[in-house]
């Protein structure tokens, strides 16, 4: 029975994403029955990943990217250091919030408990509807609901699931400044063979480059010359000295795609370190898949065997 860490307490968007991963049979070694999985709530995203490293959990469901705020930096930073971890699945969740209060609350709202990422996504709504309220930081969206239930805040920015579990009522539901807000969650475990190639896959790596002119351009060239679609590049400081960075790259394709495999081998030669973060299915095409090398391989084989080749390299 897989143990899966997630940002708790119960009622967070991360728990909602985890439940959808379970029902979609996306957890290795599990099935679509949520009783076949043991959820392990943690206080933070890094704590969930450390639970996997220590063996206290088999996987962690963590947010990695938000359409409003961009990459979830604690997740990236935790993946870049420590024992290697690997991504096995992803799920994108539509995000909207509930402004929750205790059932007997009928006065003004002076304090609002909020997870900072959530507060950023409802900033305009708060300015319009609760301009005088003071924000009180919470560990998570569900923790904001717990703060309201415990009387530590008048209202909270939380989820419908948390409101139900803590017996709260909603002042407003479906609250979000941007109606198409989405958060992408990933399922992370210890290194293992990646899920099978589907043709709609994503591969991610973290690179440490030598401090030489053109090092980043040279690394990117290994992808471009193979027609690999790069969908994300982001840098984070190594925290060891000024001017040194880890570069996170996402591309369309799978480790089993010849073009991706060749690019990774080339990056391994060029970079000080290449941390493979996984190849996994995205469910839908996220860009142009890498070209097949089958035709070129057949052409090269004929050359090596001294056989005639069709005009124009076999095309």
UniProtKB/Swiss-Prot annotation:
GO cellular component terms, semicolon-separated: cytoplasm
One example GO MF annotation: protein homodimerization activity
Ranges where the ACT domain occurs: 204-281
Residues annotated as site: Essential for activity: 183
Pathway stated in the Swiss-Prot or TrEMBL entry: Amino-acid biosynthesis; L-phenylalanine biosynthesis; phenylpyruvate from prephenate: step 1/1
EC number(s) reported in the record: 4.2.1.51
Keywords noted in UniProt: Amino-acid biosynthesis, Aromatic amino acid biosynthesis, Lyase, Phenylalanine biosynthesis
SUPFAM superfamilies for this protein: ACT-like, Periplasmic binding protein-like II
A GO BP entry: L-phenylalanine biosynthetic process
Catalytic activity: prephenate + H(+) = 3-phenylpyruvate + CO2 + H2O
Domain Prephenate dehydratase, chain residue ranges per copy: 3-190
Keyword Lyase: yes
Keyword Lyase among record annotations: yes
Name of one Pfam family that matches: ACT
NCBIfam families associated with the record: PRK11898.1
Quaternary structure and interacting proteins, as annotated: Homodimer.
Protein name (Swiss-Prot/TrEMBL): Prephenate dehydratase
Source species of the chain: Mycobacterium sp. (strain JLS)
